[in-house]
């Protein structure tokens, strides 16, 4: 007997499950297992759908007012679930709207760009096995070089330029891909496409939402000033939606920089069919340890998202270390 005055029933977990599925009362079945334990064979020999014993009175102690809200909540949840047996499938539009009171929202129809972005990002997360590598880069030497180069730059004419930190990042990523050429690749079912040039796409946010990723082609061959001026032109045409398909199609990697928004670190979704994307955070002063002493340095965190079908962990780490080496010693990008 247990504390409620009812007989304790000994049964295997499998027997209990089978009894529930068949609507059988375990208390009415004689067990043939050790110490009278009900086992699978006992359930299989039992007459089908033997009536269950009444539930203990304690189960009926809850009032209807206590049970009804839970029941109603379950009904609402079930009503909001998408039709069909697939667990985790997307909810229908009607199911989503049913969760919110009429008049509590405004419906903004998707434009073509938003639909294409949604399709590509969903495709990327569903078909590309992402993994992520992060490290911190010291920027003090880069910032000093940038300041000096900008001071030397012509102020007008076709050779005028003004370098940004992002221009150095584009160049460093392009040269890192040349240093680690196995990472400059694209997955296909027939084999890997190993790219000869580093075509670096750069995410450009658009007014009102959305983005384009115009491509700096053969970025490893271009000077910082060429990259800077070309990027300014592409970004301007992207924001006014005047890019040609050639300007944003292709690319062997992408850079997404949210540092100007104060974001310290994030992970980006790979832009298919590319195999990597570099997420760049803000530059900020942090305490660092150098020769057992605490120093203040300007640091930047970056996270590389890679397609694991193309780039293994060690290869991704090698690529990120090559990028860091160029960033921390920018003179190597000027040769």
Regions found by a protein language model. Give the residues of each.
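Short, Lys/Arg-enriched alpha-helical microdomains
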Residues: 28-48
């Amino acid at each position: 007997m247990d504390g409620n005055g009812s007989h304790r029933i000994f049964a295997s977990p499998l027997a209990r499950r089978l009894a529930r599925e068949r609507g059988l009362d375990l208390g009415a079945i004689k067990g043939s297992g050790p110490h009278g334990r009900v086992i699978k064979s006992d359930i299989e020999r039992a007459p089908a759908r033997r009536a269950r014993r009444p539930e203990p009175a304690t189960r009926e102690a809850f009032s209807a007012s206590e049970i009804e809200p839970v029941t109603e909540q379950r009904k609402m949840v079930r009503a909001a679930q998408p039709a069909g047996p697939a667990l985790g499938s997307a909810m229908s539009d009607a199911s989503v709207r049913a969760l919110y009171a009429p008049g509590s929202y405004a419906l903004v129809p998707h434009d073509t760009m938003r639909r294409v972005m949604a399709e590509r990002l969903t495709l990327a997360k569903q078909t590309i096995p992402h993994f992520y590598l992060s490290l911190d880069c010291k920027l003090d030497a880069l910032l000093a070089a940038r300041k000096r180069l900008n001071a030397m730059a012509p102020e007008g004419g076709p050779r005028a330029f003004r370098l940004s930190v992002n221009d150095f990042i584009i160049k460093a990523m392009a040269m890192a891909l040349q240093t680690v050429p196995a990472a400059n690749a694209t997955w296909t079912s027939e084999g890997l496409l190993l790219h000869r040039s580093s075509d670096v796409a750069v995410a450009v946010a658009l007014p009102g939402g959305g983005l384009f990723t115009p491509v700096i082609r053969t970025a490893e061959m271009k000077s910082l000033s060429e990259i800077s001026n070309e990027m300014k032109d592409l970004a301007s045409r992207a924001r006014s939606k005047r890019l040609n398909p050639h300007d944003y199609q292709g690319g062997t990697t992408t850079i997404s920089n949210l540092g100007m928004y104060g974001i310290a670190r994030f992970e980006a979704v790979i832009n298919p069919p590319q195999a990597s994307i570099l997420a760049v955070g803000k530059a900020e002063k942090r305490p660092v340890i150098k020769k057992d002493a605490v120093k203040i340095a300007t640091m930047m965190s970056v996270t590389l998202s890679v397609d694991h079908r193309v780039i293994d962990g060690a290869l991704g780490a090698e690529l990120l270390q090559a990028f860091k080496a160029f960033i921390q010693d920018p003179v190597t990008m000027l040769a």
